[in-house]
Curated annotation (Swiss-Prot):
Species this protein is from: Listeria monocytogenes serotype 4b (strain CLIP80459)
Cofactor note: Binds 1 lipoyl cofactor covalently.
NCBIfam families tied to this protein: gcvH, PRK01202.1
N6-lipoyllysine sites (modified residues): 63
Protein name per UniProt: Glycine cleavage system H protein
């Protein structure tokens, strides 16, 4: 299982990456593996303000439908529209081409509460 050291994580298996004033968000390799083959992704709208812990979309696999939660509070400035036609990118490359959304105006306290890769690894054990 892949677990990049430069990302931050949540106990709900989302990852967060700082990217020049914004934060890119997706689900972890562990999460996509548990879901199985992903067939559909419901994305939030650009311009939406989301609060930490809110359900902001869903991920449908051949096994189940799972809500996707905001790991931090912020404003949606981009969504990965490629996932509308190729949701399986989350399975094949969850940390790169399988990213889900990008937030700005993020609350720093939320970022500080995220887990390091080492701490997230302990959650998985």
């Amino acid at each position: 299982m892949s677990l990049p050291k430069d990302l931050l994580y949540t106990e709900e298996h989302e990852w967060v990456k700082a990217d020049e004033g914004s934060y890119v968000i997706g689900i972890t390799d562990f999460a996509q593996d548990q879901l199985g083959d992903i067939v559909f992704v419901e994305l939030p709208e650009v311009g939406d303000t989301v609060a930490k812990g809110d359900s902001i979309g869903s991920i449908e696999s051949v096994k189940t439908v799972s809500d996707f939660y905001a790991p931090v509070t912020g404003k949606v400035v981009a969504v990965n529209e490629t996932l509308e036609d190729e949701p399986e990118l989350i399975n094949s490359n969850p940390y790169d081409t399988g990213w889900i959304l990008k937030l700005e105006e993020v609350e720093e306290a939320d970022v500080k509460a995220l887990l390091s890769s080492d701490d997230y690894e302990k959650v998985l054990d």
